[in-house]
UniProtKB/Swiss-Prot annotation:
Protein name: NADH-quinone oxidoreductase subunit B
Cofactor(s) needed by this chain: [4Fe-4S] cluster
MF term (GO), any: 4 iron, 4 sulfur cluster binding
Family: Belongs to the complex I 20 kDa subunit family.
GO-annotated biological processes: aerobic respiration; electron transport coupled proton transport
Subcellular location: Cell inner membrane
Key words of the record: 4Fe-4S, Cell inner membrane, Cell membrane, Iron, Iron-sulfur, Membrane, Metal-binding, NAD, Quinone, Translocase, Transport, Ubiquinone
Free-text function comment from the UniProt entry: NDH-1 shuttles electrons from NADH, via FMN and iron-sulfur (Fe-S) centers, to quinones in the respiratory chain. The immediate electron acceptor for the enzyme in this species is believed to be ubiquinone. Couples the redox reaction to proton translocation (for every two electrons transferred, four hydrogen ions are translocated across the cytoplasmic membrane), and thus conserves the redox energy in a proton gradient.
Length: 187
């Protein structure tokens, strides 16, 4: 084979390649997740009033699939951090994020959640992205409902463009691994 022929060969790892059926399923899962967001509002300050107005009939967040807030992080896939987070609340917020099931997304709602706002002191966390990853930042003090809907549509576009896999590889059973180790030691 000539060197020119070798340059035309494309190699991929089997784990990274996606078949036709899996790509169709991924698009279907993306569409379903995009329009069925289960939100967990973590409201701590004045932005909470604007968050409630987004759910009112004038702006109607339910047409974007984020209708009912969940009151347990284990049932939610979208964490809406609404308002100022102080340093005493930071471990609680991180724990809430860790309790959420995969896939999960985070929206920083307002300037205080995004960058600490005008509370630049020792007690306020200067942006929630210091402790948890943030997918969408919604600016404003407080942000208008229209901005919130724009941020939600940005998140929906991001979710729709992601690759969604049905199931990841299963991890080895630790009990079975220990049993196999004990059996090999007895030989």
């Amino acid at each position: 084979m000539a060197d020119a022929d070798l340059a035309n060969i494309v190699t991929t790892r089997r784990d990274e390649s996606m078949g036709w059926l899996q790509s169709i399923v991924s698009k279907g899962l993306g569409w379903a997740r995009k329009y069925s967001l289960f939100t967990y509002p973590y409201a701590t300050a004045c932005c909470g009033m604007e968050y409630m107005s987004v759910a009112a009939s004038r702006h109607d967040i339910s047409r974007f699939g984020a209708e009912f807030p969940r009151f347990s992080p284990r049932q939610a896939d979208l964490l809406m951090v609404v308002g100022t987070i102080n340093l005493k609340q930071a471990p609680i917020l991180k724990r809430v994020y860790e309790q959420m099931a995969e896939p999960k997304w985070v929206v920083a709602f307002g300037v205080c959640a995004s960058s600490g706002g005008f509370y630049d002191n020792y007690a306020v966390l200067q942006g929630i992205d210091r402790i948890i990853p943030v997918d969408v930042y919604i600016p404003g003090c407080p942000p208008r409902p229209e901005q919130v809907l724009d941020g939600l549509m940005l998140l929906q576009d991001k979710i729709g463009n992601q690759v969604h896999r049905i199931a990841e590889r299963e991890e080895a059973n630790p009990t079975a691994a220990r049993h196999n180790l004990l059996l090999s030691m007895n030989k």
